[in-house]
């Protein structure tokens, strides 16, 4: 199961040729991002987890008792370690124990002896095989660490190659954009020149029309005088 953590993605695909934005542009960008994110449905990161199980705490009275104890700020009752103790014989004689108490004490002593024997066996096994077990465990960890490091290096190499390709692609595209921008400015300049020339021609035409009208009026006036 993959655990999805919000904001855990490491995105390093930054632009290589774009100019840095100013404060006003940054504010506008942040506002546009916030407006767009407000339309998104919040992701449910717990959808892949098992459904919630409602536990009936009435079946766990010991928890309720502990909660009450904690509310009262009472300390937990100490464990009874009496059965782990072996009373000295002199003390038992002074206490004038009956036969049952003597048998219980004897059984307890046997239990303690058996427990110590088991601990001794465990220590012997640990001394004999524990070192090799830890060596094997550490060897497995080293192999796992090397494998993960190799995978990490491969991923880093892939990311580096992709970023290099992106940089080259952006630089080539940027050159084309600059060429198109230059051509666009040249065309705009030419259009401006053409527009200016057209206006000059239109003005000249208007002047010629006006001159022609004046000449016609003058000719008509001369005819009327005759």
Swiss-Prot record:
A biological process from GO: mRNA processing
Keywords: Coiled coil, mRNA processing, mRNA splicing, Nucleus, Spliceosome
A cellular component annotation (GO) from this entry: catalytic step 2 spliceosome
UniProt xrefs under InterPro entries: SPF27
Record's subunit section: Component of the pre-catalytic and catalytic spliceosome complexes. Component of the postcatalytic spliceosome P complex.
Protein family per UniProt: Belongs to the SPF27 family.
Protein name, entry field: Pre-mRNA-splicing factor spf27
């Amino acid at each position: 199961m993959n655990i999805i953590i919000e904001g855990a993605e490491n995105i390093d695909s930054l632009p290589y040729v774009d100019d840095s934005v100013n404060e006003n542009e940054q504010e506008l960008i942040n506002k546009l991002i916030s407006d767009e994110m407000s339309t998104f449905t919040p992701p449910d990161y717990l959808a892949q987890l098992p459904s919630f199980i409602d536990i009936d705490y009435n079946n766990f009275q010991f928890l309720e008792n502990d909660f009450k104890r904690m509310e009262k700020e009472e300390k937990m009752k100490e464990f009874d370690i009496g059965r782990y103790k072996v009373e000295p014989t002199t003390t038992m004689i002074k206490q004038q124990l009956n036969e049952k108490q003597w048998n219980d004490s004897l059984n307890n002593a046997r239990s303690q002896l058996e427990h110590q024997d088991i601990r001794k066996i465990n220590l012997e096994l640990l001394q004999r095989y524990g070192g090799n077990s830890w060596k094997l465990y550490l060897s497995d960890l080293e192999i796992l660490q090397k494998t993960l490091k190799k995978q990490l290096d491969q991923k880093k190499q892939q990311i580096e190659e992709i970023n290099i390709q992106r940089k080259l692609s952006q630089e080539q595209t940027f050159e084309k954009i600059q060429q198109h921008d230059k051509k666009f400015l040249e065309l705009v300049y030419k259009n401006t020149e053409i527009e200016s020339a057209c206006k000059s021609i239109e003005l000249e035409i208007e002047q010629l029309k006006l001159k022609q009208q004046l000449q016609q009026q003058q000719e008509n006036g001369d005819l009327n005088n005759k």
